[in-house]
A protein has these predicted regions:
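N-terminal structural module
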Residues: 1-83
């Protein structure tokens, strides 16, 4: 079957991509905000891309078009996160 992603609704693209990796591993990503508050959130869109150099990729969607999730907001403030 051929999917034309340009003509596929975002939620349908998500379902197709999420179904490509089963079972889906879950990473727990922890961050700290600028005031010292802590956040931990589960993410399934992550993977190791390379061992040399060591490269782990984390994909984070937004809540709405202009509001990032707390994880992204915290990473932008502190430049730190733990997977």
């Amino acid at each position: 079957m051929i999917y034309d992603f340009a003509k596929t609704a975002p939620m349908d693209r998500y379902k197709l991509l999420a179904g490509c990796v089963v079972p889906r591993p879950i990473a727990l990503v922890s961050t700290t905000d600028g005031k010292g508050g802590h956040n931990a959130a589960p993410y399934s869109f992550f993977n190791v891309m390379s061992h040399e150099p060591a490269l782990l990729v984390l994909g984070v969607d937004q809540r709405r078009a202009d509001i990032p999730k707390d994880t992204v907001a915290n990473i932008r403030i502190t430049n730190d996160f733990v997977v």
